[in-house]
Amino acid sequence: MSTLRLLISDSYDPWFNLAVEECIFRQMPATQRVLFLWRNADTVVIGRAQNPWKECNTRRMEEDNVRLARRSSGGGAVFHDLGNTCFTFMAGKPEYDKTISTSIVLNALNALGVSAEASGRNDLVVKTAEGDRKVSGSAYRETKDRGFHHGTLLLNSDLSRLANYLNPDKKKLAAKGITSVRSRVTNLTELLPGITHEQVCEAITEAFFAHYGERVEAEIISPNKTPDLPNFAETFARQSSWEWNFGQAPAFSHLLDERFTWGGVELHFDVEKGHITRAQVFTDSLNPAPLEALAGRLQGCLYRADMLQQECEALLVDFPEQEKELRELSAWMAGAVR
């Protein structure tokens, strides 16, 4: 029986693909070598220990229907679209070795006519007239008896959109998370005009088979045709949840301030695991009572725009004569934390 397994996802859903990756990684026999090929529609993927409010322009993502997905490996934030090919190599220990998977990807690129080389710990670069340009970034995860190496190859990604989502708003955040380094990147289509996801997948597959000296049939998976993966529904539910994607952010503080016609407002939030642990409100408003009441209501609240709005608008019952001010405050606050 072959020790290789090849899976190709037909889904562009990042939460589905990361849930498949997680399930296979947890359940594969330690003797198996797995290659999983996939791609995501418009998504910002962040590292396991990152703060989405610090790394991403979450408001712009929401406006443009770009998803957020937290992966289980470390490293920085990346933007995925259908111009990216994603790969995951998995193996049991002691055989797991990221230099093997890196060489498989380099061999695949070489077979396609691209000479690339490893750079630093995580990147593959090509030489251009403007200097070295990154075409691939990777991240890794290891447990006691197994490991995986996953990464992306830039084929024809809309690089102009990176700055839209990976540069956060000028929010006054003092965060304990990890800040991503923005690398200089290029697409493989600059070197291989017309290169497709299917061609790249085939090249990686052939290099994978060549390295191990055996072949297997590909398993095509999609939300309508999932492999037999115990606990997949629970893993997908977690992967797609707000609690995992946002709530796992490291503790951070957020300062918001705005001047309205009726006075200036400064809000200080301390946030842990996606919940406000401390809220302070400062104002020169002639009627500070609603804002003082708001500070109390926000303690323990989920740090989510709709929840903040809900708590603010709940004060209309107690302060009906401040309706205009509270509605202005509610709309501003929701926009500021998106």
Swiss-Prot record:
GO terms for biological process: protein modification process. Pathway: Protein modification; protein lipoylation via exogenous pathway; protein N(6)-(lipoyl)lysine from lipoate: step 1/2; Protein modification; protein lipoylation via exogenous pathway; protein N(6)-(lipoyl)lysine from lipoate: step 2/2. Its EC number is 6.3.1.20. It is found in: Cytoplasm. Keywords: ATP-binding, Cytoplasm, Ligase, Nucleotide-binding. InterPro entries: aa-tRNA-synth_II/BPL/LPL, BPL_LPL_catalytic, Lipoate_ligase_A, Lipoate_protein_ligase_C, LipoylTrfase_LipoateP_Ligase. GO terms for cellular component: cytosol. It holds the Pfam family LplA-B_cat. ATP binds at R71, G76, A77, V78, F79, K134. GO terms for molecular function: ATP binding; lipoate-protein ligase activity; lipoyltransferase activity. It comes from the Bacteria. SUPFAM superfamilies: Class II aaRS and biotin synthetases, SufE/NifU. It catalyses: L-lysyl-[lipoyl-carrier protein] + (R)-lipoate + ATP = N(6)-[(R)-lipoyl]-L-lysyl-[lipoyl-carrier protein] + AMP + diphosphate + H(+). Residues 29-216 form the BPL/LPL catalytic domain. (R)-lipoate binds at K134. Monomer. In the transfer reaction, the free carboxyl group of lipoic acid is attached via an amide linkage to the epsilon-amino group of a specific lysine residue of lipoyl domains of lipoate-dependent enzymes. Belongs to the LplA family. Catalyzes both the ATP-dependent activation of exogenously supplied lipoate to lipoyl-AMP and the transfer of the activated lipoyl onto the lipoyl domains of lipoate-dependent enzymes. This is Lipoate-protein ligase A. It comes from Escherichia coli O45:K1 (strain S88 / ExPEC).
